[in-house]
Design a protein with these regions (language model features):
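Short, thiol/selenol-centered motifs that function as redox-active sites or metal-ligating centers
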Residues: 47-71, 134-138
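Preference for long, well-ordered alpha-helical segments
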Residues: 127-144
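Mobile cap/lid helix-loop segments that border enzyme active or cofactor-binding sites
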Residues: 1-45, 66-69, 76
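Amphipathic, charged-and-aliphatic alpha-helical interface segments
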Residues: 49, 91-110, 132-135
Length: 144
């Protein structure tokens, strides 16, 4: 009889058991979320939390939302991920969260206008691949 379910209680057990190749993904996640890139870390955490919420992974949503709040030093208990349009975040980040939603729901639904709404705030086009990468990482982690 397999002891699989007892052995793998969390994603971390899976990573540790297969560290020779899983370590690369862990390092990728660390670089993606923590290295200075086009997006501030709190927005990357917010994207991760938003996608996790859309995917029904409350564990990841709650953790990444709290990290984002702490990075913002925001004492506001309101959840900006519930209503992006009226969220108390800078306007330039709202199109990024909207684009992240489309990446998660149906990447083929993304139109030039969606990208233009992000780029109009002076972001480099590389920010689009960064958004897609964060969404992909969240999707993977939400299903492991």
């Amino acid at each position: 009889m397999s002891n699989f379910l007892n052995k793998y209680k969390s994603v971390y057990d899976v990573f540790l058991d297969n560290w020779s190749y899983q370590s690369h993904f862990v390092l990728y996640l660390e670089a993606l979320m923590r290295q200075q890139t086009l997006l501030p870390t709190y927005i990357k955490e917010m994207i991760f939390a938003y996608i996790s919420g859309l995917n029904g992974c409350q564990y990841c949503k709650n953790i990444h939302a709290e990290i984002s709040k702490k990075l913002l030093r925001d004492a506001n208990e309101e959840d900006p991920l519930l209503d992006i349009e009226n969220a108390g975040i800078e306007e330039k980040y709202k199109p990024i969260l909207k684009l992240a939603h489309k990446v998660n729901a149906d990447i083929k639904s993304i139109a030039d206008e969606d990208v233009d709404q992000v780029l109009q705030y002076g972001f480099d086009e590389q920010v689009i691949s960064e958004i897609i990468s964060i969404c992909g990482a969240a999707q993977f982690m939400n299903t492991v």
